[in-house]
Structures are given as structure tokens and as C-alpha cells.
């Protein structure tokens, strides 16, 4: 066995050769350089930002959002797009389902004029477009809606009754292998929206599974299970849904946390509703009977009135959000102009 100095010298020579061939930073000791903080994109719900552990969705990673139909998956993704754009970022939406509603997206705060949209014919075309956009280095976030709609070319060109076992799974596996490194280098967040299917013959455990094979489960840094748990009503009229999101996988923070928030029809995630819920939980907002009070000032009787007060008084809402984030140690900068994504120490 070589002596320790000889081994160290041989290692240094090898590292120098690697850096010469593949560029500086291709290989390094983990302690050589201070880890860069994880940059994030806020989700629009402070409860979900807290559940994610770092204040939002991590940049440069693969995110999977799945759940039953009409549970709020696309709404959560569009809020992330709006927040990325608010910070000056560029966003793309791959509408494989051909179901994007520009008017609804605009109501959620998405700048539809600058949003890049593609409605591809095949799964191969969709993922090739995503790969090219990511490798441009100019994209901050891309949403693929949805994995189930990424139909392989062979299936489209075949007959209706033909069997195409594993085609989509192989397509996703190949695409994610190519994409993951480029995402990290460019700092682009890729959100894959996915649907649920039932596994036949399951006797024990959950029969639910997601489409597109197992590759996405492995490559995703964050997987979010979105469920509608309650219908919100104003009298007899339905005005929205109470939504629960479970973080079933998280590579950047402890997983299995849950968040609940309101999604209002035509308005999306209620930021003010989340602030009221979290403010009460953290002791910044006092609830006495039906009244909500903040630092001696009455916000309103009932959650809806308190929500409207914060909607009309953005400065108070920003102040509450700033205090919650400081107490919990999650970081997005809250200014008088709104919420801006910022690096988070982790």
C-alpha cells in the first residue's frame, strides 16, 4: 500500500487532471467550499412554505405535485409561476392536457403575456422542448401539466386497441436522466403535475399510484400529495375548497409535514387565510370567540371579515408574514411590495 503522502499526491494529480478535462469544480472536497444556501420560490401559502421546511420550492430541482381531479394541483403550480415571475424570473408552461385557462392564470397573478406556453403533440416533443428550454439557462420555472398526458409517439401512431406496456415509463426515465443535471446547473425548477390511478388487486395498503413509472418518484426532490378536504361556503353558495397538502418526499428538509389552506374559486390560494391560520397557531393573532385581533387591532368578526381586512391592508399582512417567517426561521424577504424569493440558509 502506498504511503499517505504518495496517496495524497496521486489524488491531487488525479483531481487536477479531472478539472483540466471537465472544468473547475468537477470534483471537490465537501469542506473546501461553503455550501450555497438553497434558493426558493414561494408557493403563495405560508402554511405550505413552512411545511416544505425552507420557505418554498427549491430551485434547480424536480418537484412532483399529484392528487385526485380538481384538488388544486394546477393552482399550486400556477402560484409558484406567479411568484417566480414577480421576482423577475422567466416561466414556461407545457400544456400537454391542452387545458390551460389564461384568464384563471391571470387572476392568480401570472403574467400571461410573458409566460412561455407549449401545447405539444407527443410526449417526446414535450420533454424535448422542456430539455431545450432548461439548457438555455434562461428559465426559472417550468410546469409540465400533466405526466399522464405525455403520450408516446408510438401510442399515438398505433391502433386504438394496441398494447404499449412501459412506453411512457421508459420515456420519463430517459428524460429525467438527461434533465436532472441541467436543472441543477441552470437553477430551473421543474414541476411535474401528475394524476392518480388505482392498482388492481391490492388487498393491503393504498391502492393509489401515480402515472409514468417509478423514475419521477426517484428523481423528485419534493413530492406533494394535494387533497380537497372540505367545501367552503358563503351561506349556501360554494366559494372555494379547503385543501390539505402532504409532503410525502423531501430531500431538502424533513418530510411528512402537512399544510392546510383555502383555495377560493376565481382567486386561487388565499394568502390572507393562510396568514390568519398561521398567525393564530404562532400566537401573533388572537382569536376570541369569532373575533380575530392583531396587536390590539380588531381584524374582523369571522375569518372571512378578517381575510378581507388583510386583503385591504397589505402592510399589516406583510408584517404578520414577516414575524411568522422570522419566528420559524424560514426565509423569503417580505417587503411593502410583496413577497420576494430569497436564498434560505440550510
Curated annotation (Swiss-Prot):
ATP binds at residues 67-74. The keyword Cell membrane does not apply. Its main location: cytoplasm. GO terms for molecular function: ATP binding; ATP hydrolysis activity; ATP-dependent DNA damage sensor activity; damaged DNA binding; single-stranded DNA binding. It comes from the Bacteria. Keywords: ATP-binding, Cytoplasm, DNA damage, DNA recombination, DNA repair, DNA-binding, Nucleotide-binding, SOS response. Pfam families: RecA, RecA_C. InterPro entries: AAA+_ATPase, DNA_recomb/repair_RecA, DNA_recomb/repair_RecA_CS, P-loop_NTPase, RecA-like_C, RecA-like_N, RecA_ATP-bd, RecA_C_sf. Belongs to the RecA family. PANTHER family: MITOCHONDRIAL DNA REPAIR PROTEIN RECA HOMOLOG-RELATED, RECA. Can catalyze the hydrolysis of ATP in the presence of single-stranded DNA, the ATP-dependent uptake of single-stranded DNA by duplex DNA, and the ATP-dependent hybridization of homologous single-stranded DNAs. It interacts with LexA causing its activation and leading to its autocatalytic cleavage. NCBIfam families: tigrfam_recA (TIGR02012). This is Protein RecA. It comes from Mycobacterium ulcerans (strain Agy99).
Amino acid at each position: 500500500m502506498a504511503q499517505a503522502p504518495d496517496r495524497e499526491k496521486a489524488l491531487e494529480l488525479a483531481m487536477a487532471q479531472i478539472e483540466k478535462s471537465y472544468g473547475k469544480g468537477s470534483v471537490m472536497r465537501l469542506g473546501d467550499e461553503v455550501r450555497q444556501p438553497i434558493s426558493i420560490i414561494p408557493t403563495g401559502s405560508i402554511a405550505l412554505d413552512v411545511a416544505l421546511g425552507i420557505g418554498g420550492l427549491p430551485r434547480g430541482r424536480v418537484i412532483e405535485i399529484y392528487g385526485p381531479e380538481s384538488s388544486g394541483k394546477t393552482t399550486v403550480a400556477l402560484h409558484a409561476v406567479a411568484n417566480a415571475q414577480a421576482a423577475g424570473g422567466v416561466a414556461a408552461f407545457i400544456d400537454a392536457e391542452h387545458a390551460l385557462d389564461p384568464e384563471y392564470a391571470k387572476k392568480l397573478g401570472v403574467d400571461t403575456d410573458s409566460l412561455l406556453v407549449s401545447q405539444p403533440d407527443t410526449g417526446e416533443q414535450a420533454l424535448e422542448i422542456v430539455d431545450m428550454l432548461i439548457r438555455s439557462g434562461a428559465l426559472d420555472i417550468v410546469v409540465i401539466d400533466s405526466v399522464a398526458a405525455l403520450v408516446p409517439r408510438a401510442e399515438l401512431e398505433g391502433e386504438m386497441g394496441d398494447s404499449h406496456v412501459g412506453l411512457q415509463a421508459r420515456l420519463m426515465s430517459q428524460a429525467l436522466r438527461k434533465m436532472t443535471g441541467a436543472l441543477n446547473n441552470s437553477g430551473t425548477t421543474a414541476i411535474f403535475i401528475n394524476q392518480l390511478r388505482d392498482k388492481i388487486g391490492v388487498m393491503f395498503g393504498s391502492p393509489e399510484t401515480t402515472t409514468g413509472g417509478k423514475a419521477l418518484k426517484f428523481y423528485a426532490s419534493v413530492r406533494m400529495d394535494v387533497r380537497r378536504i372540505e367545501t367552503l361556503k358563503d351561506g349556501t353558495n360554494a366559494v372555494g375548497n379547503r385543501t390539505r397538502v402532504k409532503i410525502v418526499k423531501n430531500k431538502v428538509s424533513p418530510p411528512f409535514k402537512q399544510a392546510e389552506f383555502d383555495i377560493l374559486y376565481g382567486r386561487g390560494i388565499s394568502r390572507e387565510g393562510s396568514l390568519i391560520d398561521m398567525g393564530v397557531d404562532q400566537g401573533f393573532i388572537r382569536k376570541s370567540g369569532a373575533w380575530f385581533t392583531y396587536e390590539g387591532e380588531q381584524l374582523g368578526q369571522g375569518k372571512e371579515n378578517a381575510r378581507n381586512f388583510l386583503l385591504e391592508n397589505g402592510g399589516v399582512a406583510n408584517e404578520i408574514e414577516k414575524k411568522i417567517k422570522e419566528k420559524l426561521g424560514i426565509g423569503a424577504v417580505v417587503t411593502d411590495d410583496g413577497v420576494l424569493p430569497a436564498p434560505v440558509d440550510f
